Amino acid sequence: MACEVKHCGEIRDFKKVQEYFGLGHDDNWLNAINHAISPTGELIAMAQGEKLAFLSTCWSSHGNGNTYVLGWCGELEDPNQIVTSLTCLPMTQNKSTDGAIEWTCVAVGLCSGMVTFYTDSGVKLFSQCCQEDPVIGVKLQSAPRHSEADSLLYIIYPRCLCFIQGQDILPTLNNCRHNVQRGALERSSYPTADVVPFQKYKFKQEREAVINDAAISTTQRPPTYDYIVQQTIGLGYFAKVHATPPRSSQVLAAGAEPYLGFFQAEEGYKTMSLGEVAKDVIGIAYKNLLGGIFRRAPEPLPSPEESPLPVPTKEAPMRIRCRLYDGKRDGLTLSVAPGGRLAVVTDNLDRVMLVDTHQAIILRVWKGYRDAQCAFVPVKEKSVRGIKTHKRKALFLVIYAPRMGCLDIWALQNGPKVAAFNVSKSGQLMYNNHSPLGSGGSSGSGNSSSQSRKSLAINHCLFLDPSDGSLKEIHIPFHYALSETSSQTSRDIHMLRRLRNQLRTINHGQAKDEALQEIGELASELQTLEVRQQCLEMLLKSKKLQPQVFQSIINAFIKKPLSESTGSEEFVNQIENYKRLTDLYLALSQANQREDNEPPVEYLELSDADLVTINKLVLLLDDGTEKDKPAATREVSFKLQAEHKTEEFVDYLSIFNIDSPDGISLLPEKSDKFGAVSIDLFSQFFAQGLCFGQFKQWINQACLPSRDLLKLIIWFWLEKPFKYNNCDEVVEDMSRIAAMVQTICDLAGEHIHDYAYNAISPWWQEVRELLLESKQFSGLLVAIVCKTVATNLWRNRKEGSCDESSQNEDDERWERISHDEAQWGLLTGKLEDVAVLGAILSKPLICRDPVGPEMSYEPPDCSLKSIVSSGKGIVTELTAKWLISAQLHPSKVLEISPPENELDDESKVKIKDEPTKESVDEDAESEEDLEMAKEVYAASKEAHEPILERLALLRAHFPFSLESGVLLSLMSWQYMVQWSKQLSSLDHLKAALLCLNQFRTPDWALKHGICCMLWNATLKFPLQAAAKLIQKVGRLPVDKMCQQDLEMSAGKVPEFLELSLEFLQHFTASMEHDKRELHFEQSLSEGALPLQFLALQQHHAMPQLLRLQTELCSVLHFVSFFQLRIPKPLTTLFDSMSNKALLADINKELPYVLPAPDLVLQQQRTEFLCRLVTATMDLIREDLEQLYILDHVFYMGKICALADSWEVDKLPILRRQVVELYAFGYDAEAQVLLQDISDDEELGRLLLEIAGRRLNLYAQSSQSTFLKIASVGHQLLAYLDNLKEPMTENNIQIAATKPDEIDVAALDRLLSHAYKYLCRRESKQLPIIGQMYNAVRILQN
């Protein structure tokens, strides 16, 4: 243990404070400011000029040190004031028994003599001026612990000191803070004193004396003898000496002329002599007599109500004890040690002087410390663990020389320099010598409460390092205060240093045996218990401790024990236990080949079912990487063990309880290290052969309980890598483990069978509980081994019992299995299921035809305990995540043959129609043949997809949890949840819809429930945001708005709305469903409710609300896809009640009835749909005389579906479609649609207009053509001229732009269709169509 400068705090806002003071370019800026830190470390105060900054602690996850942030910064109320000193005063409550700090007060001294008190949050509480001189310092003199004295707050001025009792200032500050917290504006409700009572003591200054610093060394009553000597020296022969010395405070002042002064500030009233008393009595009588003669009454005493506020008493001069003069020397700073016995003074001549304050003498002088900063560090002796010793105390002096950048530590009073550190040259050494205000004697409530408080940790000395913005503490071990020549501890410390250096160089050039011998000799030279304990702790903390080194040191301690008077019984027990552990470790790790007389390990006899299970695990976990290296890697791994026994050995020692004298036991809280330790401990033993004779001997010598040894063996198997090529290798290793378990049971003796007949064995029950938490696949193999060993032991004991002869054959026939064996059977069954589950899910696979987005996958924790206790839906959830990571198409999740609960009606009808003459057995056989045929066909069809093979294996173990409907529910949920985290990734939404599309009809109840949950959890709010955005803009928003509100680009919004519409269609289709019941495996216990159960618990969606959401989604999709501009589409196409219903929960019934749409709303909807029909024309494209019209037909189907939902007349929609097709020149497609429209005069008028526009365009081809058309009649010519006028909204624009594009024959057919619709009624346009028909005939001829 050496001196250290440890990091204990971090100041995050260090640069911010530096910039706040305007000193950002000054490296030594800390010298230009005033600073103080709370002795309990919760606050740092800094000030410069009129600026203040308070840094408070905050919680940080990095390390255990304090983290300081800027809590408050501000300026003084008076900008003309300048801060000259700072002090932090932690405050405690009188009623607090633990001494906890409630808040921190900051006392700020100003150049005007004012002292202002602030809270730690920067709120001004109270201010008082005791002397109109600059304040040199504000300090607190704490009372000794468990004393009746009171703390003393004193203010240092250039000519005087002002004392304020702690019991006077404490309630004032608490009262002011209470007023601030309550927000009280009237002081009458919370009375406080305007002036806190204080006592002023004046320095007797002669010549041109200067006071730079002062401090109180003690406030205790001086001893009688010292008091008599002081009075005699001070007053001479006629000195008056009292029987009880008055209480006085000794004040030390550093400055110039004198360099150092010792003063006495006497407290209380001075005792008067008999003559002074007689003089005062005569004066009072004379005054009263004259008052009676002149009819003047004596002055009444002031009443308590009229008495003024307390005022300071008359200043009293301090009595000079002695002074040290030095004309060239000026004292700069003064620091008093804890206890007040010593003080240190720095001066302008680069000297540091140690002063004895009681004797008033200079004890020691250090030279060469320019601008030094000093601090005292008290250190207590630490007691050895488990040994009660008297704690001694030592005092060290820390001197910081900023010019040299060094930090020196000196032992007091006459000790040497014990350490020196290089630190920053711009730092500050911060020293505190006071306790919190309110603790100790300042509580004012008696000594009983103060004695019950716990002592707070005081940071006496801290170093503020601006280079890295950190706060550092100086750690000094106690033994540095001991004498180097006479102390046995110091000698042992020196030997410990040599031992540590020897340990560092053990592997560098020196022979190992010689090094171990020298280390043992050095360890045996340690003669003190404390240093031996330190040596042991040093070894256990080392990460590179070698077993042979540790054994050598332990043997040295045992061979040369300490004297019995030192009370080292517990330490001796620890050493002996460590020796047993080390010997066992070396014996097992250095095991040689098995002896010749050792019987070979018998192969374990396993049942066929166990062999099938083992072979299944080997095939599942075989990845093909180890086939080329059958056994070489396993042997090499064991040979390398001898070179890597450093950290493993330390962990091995740490998992045992070595404090008990009876033996060694495992520590349950270190169970996380059992696996690694057991691998390191037993690997060599298993690799070199099992020598059980020596093994029993080693265990008996180590005094290790058999129960703990069995735990380590099981952990060894569980942590061992599962790398086998075939089943024979597994059985071989299982046989070794079985032999080891059998040996441990032999060591345990009859303790194993200490339980009632046919009850559960406590010995094996602990093993089963350990296997429940196993996360590896080897847990099943260990369970099989232990079950076999336990069964053999039980049967051997049963055969050897004398009661067996009395049992008859019937009893033997029925009583074949015990209760304990039944428990093993249940455990192995569960472990088999979980092992298969873990083996499959631990290896993520990608299917041959991946579908859907990639999702990250982490192999789950598949221990039996986690699977059984995580609820009934855990298997479904884990398998769904595995299937999603495999990117398997959801259609392949469906079972080859539906489960019993999913038989459809057709299969039931077929079963009923079968002949009833066949027996039940024949029916069962035919069904089994049919299923086998289906499986063979499916297997050939899927071309041996590995994922489907593993899924089928999982379904054999978990048939209910892995039904297709349940899996699809979880997969769709996982996809949608992932999409909700990143809305722009629409691939996840598509994958979820693909899962919803694969639900079978019997699973529609699950589908409807999961749709309800997905709507409320993921889709509802993005869809509402899109509706709100389109309602605001009236069209598809720009990309920036979509990114801000929808977290996706504008180009993805139409696709998102289309997918949402598809989801709502799935939602609507699943409304009609049958009842669905869920089944779970019995091994899964109750826990968190599974998702499929929550889905079935959902209320059905309301059809009206679902229809409204579908209509809204359709409108939003049309507006965004066709980029229409519709102002306020939600209020235009939906009434107010419908808009309100769109915000309601989809599975809660509305409290009102939605009204039927009025004529205006229906007209607006019709116009919107007609605009959509016009927009769909852009989807028709023509390429190489081939027309692509499927997209147009697809969206026309959607438009008609929306019209049906709105109950809008579809005739205007079909009319618009026909007209638009004719306008774009698609006459053949339009002619097909005319068959659906029987009687519509408006359609005839529009067709006539299209024909007129075509004729107008054709007339532009030549002059003769125009003359032919004009020769028909003036009425046609006038009609054609009207069509040439500017276009309006009601007019129709044709797509043709050139006369060559007009087909006269098609125009003839168009006129015939127009005439068919106009001739049914006497229309005014019949003459026009007749003349136009004649004109077309002329053009044709």
UniProtKB/Swiss-Prot annotation:
Biological role stated in the UniProt entry: Regulatory subunit of the Rab3 GTPase-activating (Rab3GAP) complex composed of Rab3-GAP and Rab3GAP1, which has both GTPase-activating protein (GAP) activity towards Rab3, and guanine nucleotide exchange factor (GEF) activity towards Rab18. As part of the Rab3GAP complex, required for the rapid induction and sustained expression of synaptic homeostasis at the neuromuscular junction (NMJ). Also participates in the regulation of autophagy in tissues such as larval fat cells and adult muscles.
- A GO BP entry: regulation of GTPase activity
Traced from the root, the source organism's taxonomic lineage reads: Eukaryota, Metazoa, Ecdysozoa, Arthropoda, Hexapoda
Disruption-associated phenotype: Third instar larvae display adherent perinuclear redistribution of lysosomes, autolysosomes and autophagosomes in the fat body.
GO CC terms of this entry: autolysosome; autolysosome membrane; autophagosome; autophagosome membrane; axon; plasma membrane; presynaptic membrane; synapse
Give one GO molecular function term.
Answer: GTPase activator activity
Where is this chain compositionally biased, Basic and acidic residues type? 906-919
Protein name, per record? Rab3 GTPase-activating protein non-catalytic subunit
Subunit architecture: The Rab3 GTPase-activating (Rab3GAP) complex is a heterodimer composed of Rab3GAP1 and Rab3-GAP.
Question: How the protein sits in the membrane?
Answer: Peripheral membrane protein
Q: Where is the segment annotated Disordered?
A: 432-452, 896-928
